[in-house]
Swiss-Prot record:
Gene Ontology, cellular component aspect: chloroplast thylakoid membrane; plasma membrane; proton-transporting ATP synthase complex
PANTHER family in alphabetical order: ATP SYNTHASE SUBUNIT A, CHLOROPLASTIC
Name listed for the protein in its UniProt record: ATP synthase subunit a, chloroplastic
Subunit structure: F-type ATPases have 2 components, CF(1) - the catalytic core - and CF(0) - the membrane proton channel. CF(1) has five subunits: alpha(3), beta(3), gamma(1), delta(1), epsilon(1). CF(0) has four main subunits: a, b, b' and c.
InterPro entries documented for this protein: ATP_syn_F0_a_bact/chloroplast, ATP_synth_F0_asu, ATP_synth_F0_asu_AS, F0_ATP_A_sf
A GO molecular-function annotation: proton-transporting ATP synthase activity, rotational mechanism
Gene: atpI
Pfam family membership, one: ATP-synt_A
Domain of life: Eukaryota
TM ranges: 38-58, 95-115, 134-154, 199-219, 220-240
């Protein structure tokens, strides 16, 4: 019987399939480390845009704001209102953190639709929005997790951990699991939405390359803005929750 050779061949086939990587990636070898070059390149571009915008905003401030200064002041006021609504009266120290998260994600998401990443050729893979990669979204979610633990411990000391046995100690495992799943939900929600948006646009452009994809691209810009707002709102809400101790 050829059962054993067939089984071995089947296992080999499954192993080869499991080794297939979805998409290609371009890496830099720095010392003994592999660095994901695609994410770094696009992230540096986004950071450069943000730093350039900040430099323009503070270059020549006027007592009576001009159009450009009005815009940047509106953005700052929006972030302050968002932080105050979710965190409460002690929101002040957290405005830079929430603002950085919101602006980086917002510009990253929009860069995927507005910047012509595809014209830059790489040896492997292609450039896309930084938030199109799970490494970026996890890297954004983990500091958020650290931030709300830090906020709670700073405000309440070791008494912060008392929330895990409220309203009853029976809920201890669930309360612990809830805190450690927050960064997972933040990262996968952002990654999934941005990846799906870019894939839909790519498929439509390949099928109908003229007019039809344009409304979808505008819809993508809108949903990208909403995703940045959701991430920043949840980050601020988690920080406020850890400081106030309510659910």
């Amino acid at each position: 019987m050829n059962v054993l050779p067939c089984s071995i061949n089947t296992l080999k086939g499954l192993y080869e399939i499991s080794g297939v990587e979805v998409g290609q990636h371009f890496y830099w070898q720095i010392g003994g480390f592999q660095v994901h070059a695609q994410v770094l390149i696009t992230s540096w571009v986004v950071i450069a845009i943000l730093l350039g915008s900040a430099a323009i905003a503070v270059r020549n401030p006027q007592t009576i704001p001009t159009d450009g200064q009005n815009f940047f002041e509106y953005v700052l006021e929006f972030i302050r209102d968002l932080s105050k609504t979710q965190i409460g009266e002690e929101y002040g120290p957290w405005v830079p953190f929430i603002g950085t998260m919101f602006l980086f994600i917002f510009v990253s998401n929009w860069s995927g639709a507005l910047l012509p990443w595809k014209i830059i050729q790489l040896p492997h893979g292609e450039l896309a929005a930084p938030t199109n990669d799970i490494n970026t979204t996890v890297a954004l979610a983990l500091p958020t997790s650290v931030a709300y633990f830090y906020a709670g411990l700073t405000k309440k000391g070791l008494g912060y951990f008392g929330k895990y046995i409220q309203p009853t100690p029976i809920l201890l495992p669930i309360n612990i699991l809830e805190d450690f799943t927050k960064p997972l939900s933040l990262s996968f929600r952002l990654f999934g939405n941005i990846l799906a948006d870019e894939l839909v646009v790519v498929v439509l452009v390949s099928l109908v390359p003229s007019v039809v994809p344009i409304p979808v691209m505008f819809l993508g810009l809108f949903t990208s803005s909403i995703q940045a707002l959701i991430f920043a709102t949840l980050a601020a809400a988690y920080i406020g929750e850890s400081m106030e101790g309510h659910h």
